[in-house]
Curated annotation (Swiss-Prot):
HAMAP family: Undec_diphosphatase. InterPro entries: UppP (IPR003824). One of its GO terms (molecular function) is undecaprenyl-diphosphatase activity. The gene is uppP. GO terms for biological process: cell wall organization; peptidoglycan biosynthetic process; regulation of cell shape; response to antibiotic. It comes from Porphyromonas gingivalis (strain ATCC BAA-308 / W83). Coiled coil: none annotated. It is found in: Cell inner membrane. This is Undecaprenyl-diphosphatase.
Length: 280
């Protein structure tokens, strides 16, 4: 993989990771256009540059992640409740993460096989686009933006759909899950960003470990520049993408993303029917 190819893939990652449009589908198209061979390192690279995207969330929402005020309702209720309230966001993220950890571990081999099918990605991308045309009507936005522990768990269950249906988009699944729980578009999107941090960090570390087992430390030394550049570019682009997405989603809803998904999914299907070789 060249530096230029790494930069292009990182731009695609940064633009699509937090939008409900399937970063996997876009990576397939980008790799196909550039003629990037789907080696074990390339597959690892597309996961490991998620670390840059994770950092963009931590930077943009640093006050939410790294400030630990006691909730007013917990003041004077004892040290236990005050402690729990300080880390309320972390407890909710932990609860939301549990379903994906359990199901991902139990069905890891099956998930890997599904993820390796470009047809599955393309069809799910296309059908998910049709569904998104109706999301705003199915789950009317609410001003009740508070996320409770049960709501966090349900959103975590929705995240599992993206694990078993590559091409669905983790962002789409969790945001729709939040709206189904009567959260506002903004609250649902922001919790989706927050949940991406432990989810994607876990996936990145797991992929790095597997790559290490396969090629040892030398494979990281050999591709250090590509990995570093990829993460920096993904970080910068994701910063802009998140800011754009929050404003656009709050104002216009999901329909535009639905049409876009249909277009991209349809393009993948046409390319494969035309005999173009594509790989995840």
């Amino acid at each position: 993989m060249t530096i230029l190819q790494a930069i292009v893939l990182a731009i695609v990652e940064g633009l699509t990771e937090f939008l409900p449009v399937s970063s996997t589908g876009h990576m397939i198209i980008a790799e196909g256009i550039m003629g990037v061979e789907s080696t074990s390192f390339v597959r690892a690279f597309t996961v490991m540059i998620q670390f840059g995207a994770i950092l963009s969330v931590l930077v943009l929402y640093r006050k939410r992640f790294f400030c630990f005020p006691v909730a007013p309702r917990a003041l004077g209720q004892g040290k236990g409740k005050e402690f729990m309230s300080r880390f309320d966001l972390y407890w909710k993220l932990l609860i939301a993460l549990v379903p994906a950890v359990i199901l991902g571990f139990l069905f890891e081999d099956w998930v890997d096989r599904m993820l390796g099918s470009v047809w599955v990605v393309a069809v799910v991308l296309f059908l998910g686009g049709i569904f998104m045309l109706f999301v705003d009507k199915l789950f009317a936005s609410s001003d009740r933006g508070e996320i409770t522990y049960p709501k966090a768990f349900v959103i975590g269950l929705f995240q599992c759909l993206a694990i078993f249906l590559p091409g669905l988009s983790r962002s789409m699944a969790t945001i729709v899950g939040g709206q189904q729980q009567k959260l506002s578009r903004k609250a649902a999107a922001e919790f989706s960003f927050f949940l991406a941090v432990p989810t994607m960090l876990g996936a990145t570390l797991l992929k790095a470990y597997k790559l290490y087992k396969e090629g040892g430390i030398e494979i990281f030394r050999e591709h250090m520049t590509v990995l570093l550049v990829g993460n920096i570019v993904a970080f910068i682009v994701a910063l802009a993408a998140i800011k754009f997405f929050i404003g656009f989603l709050t104002r216009y809803g999901f329909k535009a993303f639905g049409y876009y998904r249909i277009l991209v999914g349809g393009l993948l299907i046409v390319l494969m029917l035309s005999g173009v070789s594509l790989a995840v």
